[in-house]
C-alpha cells in the first residue's frame, strides 16, 4: 500500500525481499520511483526519515528493535502529544467554529459521566456514541433511546480509559466526503485534495471513489454551492494550522458529510472526524493523480 503514495526516491519497508519482484513490476508499469527496504536493513542506515501510516508506541518500539536510531524516531513526549491531539474531543471543539453559514450544520457532544451518557441516549430516539481514541468506523455504539446495561458498561470502560465518550445525533446522510491536508511541521497546514468515500451500515470504511478534485467538487456541488466548499477549506487551513501546525508533520484528513434535514435541505457537516495520520483518501488522491486519465469517470 505505501508504494502508491510514497514520495519519489523513497523506500518501502517490508519484512523481507520476498516483495521485491512485485514492487519492481509495479514500479516499471506505473513509473514509480520507489525502492524496497527490508527489516534487516533498517539497522544499516542512519538519518532516515520514517513516514508510517500513523505513529503509535508499538511501532516506535518495533523500529527501535530493528535498529532505528533515537534521532530518527519521534520522542516519547511527542507520542503523548500526538495521542492527546488525536482525541475526538478536538473535533467536538472545532465543529462550532466551522458552521460558517446556513449551509453548515452538525452537533457533537463530549460526555464525561455515566449520567451524561444516559441523559444523551434516553433524550433521543436514536444516537451514536463514539470512543474518543478510535477512527475509521471503529469504536462506535449505535443506540435506540434506551441506556441498556451493555451500553452503560461500554461507556464506563471507554470513559475510564479515554476520558469520556462522544455523542452525536443520527443524520440522514447523503454523501461521505473528506478534505485532506498536509502539515509541514513548521506551523503551516495546507489543503491537499478532496476525497469521496463509502461506509457500510455500521459505519466501517468500505472504499473510495477515484476522481479528480474537479469532478469531486462537481459531484458535491449538486447538493451545496461549490463556493461553500472553498470557504470551508480556507477556514480549515487556518484552524488546523493553529491546532496542529506547531508540532505535526504529515498528512491529515477531516471527514465530513452531506446530509438532508427534516425540511429536505442539503447541509454540510464540516467535521465528523479528524484523522491525524495518513488515510485512504490520500491513497485515492495519489492513485487518481498518477494513474487516471484526465477524462476518466
Label for each model-derived stretch:
Residues 107-108, 127-151, 178, 201-220:
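Glycine-rich phosphate-binding loop of ATP-grasp-fold ATP-dependent ligases
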Residues 151-206, 257-271, 279:
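Phosphate-binding site of ATP-dependent enzymes
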Amino acid at each position: 500500500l505505501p508504494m502508491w503514495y510514497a514520495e519519489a526516491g523513497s523506500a518501502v519497508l517490508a519484512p523481507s525481499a520476498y516483495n521485491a519482484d512485485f514492487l519492481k513490476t509495479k514500479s516499471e508499469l506505473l513509473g514509480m520511483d520507489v525502492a524496497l527496504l527490508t527489516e534487516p536493513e533498517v539497522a544499516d542506515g542512519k538519518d532516515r526519515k520514517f513516514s508510517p501510516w500513523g505513529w503509535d508506541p508499538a511501532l516506535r518500539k518495533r523500529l527501535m528493535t530493528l535498529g532505528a536510531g533515537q534521532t530518527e524516531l519521534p520522542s516519547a513526549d511527542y507520542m503523548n502529544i500526538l495521542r492527546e491531539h488525536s482525541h475526538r474531543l478536538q473535533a467536538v471543539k472545532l465543529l462550532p467554529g466551522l458552521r460558517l453559514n446556513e449551509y453548515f450544520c452538525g452537533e457533537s457532544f463530549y460526555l464525561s459521566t455515566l449520567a451524561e451518557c444516559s441523559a444523551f441516549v434516553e433524550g433521543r430516539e436514536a444516537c451514536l456514541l463514539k470512543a474518543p481514541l478510535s477512527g475509521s468506523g471503529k469504536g462506535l455504539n449505535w443506540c435506540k433511546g434506551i441506556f441498556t446495561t451493555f451500553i452503560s458498561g461500554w461507556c464506563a470502560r471507554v470513559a475510564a480509559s479515554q476520558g469520556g465518550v462522544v455523542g452525536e445525533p443520527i443524520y440522514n446522510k447523503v454523501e461521505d466526503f473528506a478534505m485532506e491536508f498536509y502539515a509541514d511541521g513548521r506551523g503551516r497546514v495546507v489543503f491537499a485534495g478532496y476525497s469521496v468515500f463509502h461506509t457500510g451500515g455500521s459505519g466501517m470504511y468500505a472504499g473510495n471513489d477515484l476522481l479528480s478534485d474537479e469532478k469531486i467538487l462537481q459531484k458535491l456541488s449538486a447538493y451545496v454551492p461549490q463556493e461553500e466548499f472553498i470557504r470551508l477549506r480556507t477556514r480549515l487551513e487556518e484552524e488546523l494550522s493553529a491546532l496542529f501546525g506547531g508540532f505535526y508533520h504529515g498528512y491529515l484528513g477531516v471527514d465530513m458529510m452531506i446530509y438532508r434535514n427534516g425540511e429536505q435541505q442539503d447541509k454540510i457537516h464540516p467535521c465528523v472526524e479528524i484523522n491525524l495520520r495518513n488515510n485512504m483518501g490520500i491513497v485515492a488522491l495519489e492513485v487518481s493523480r498518477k494513474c487516471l486519465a484526465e477524462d476518466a469517470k
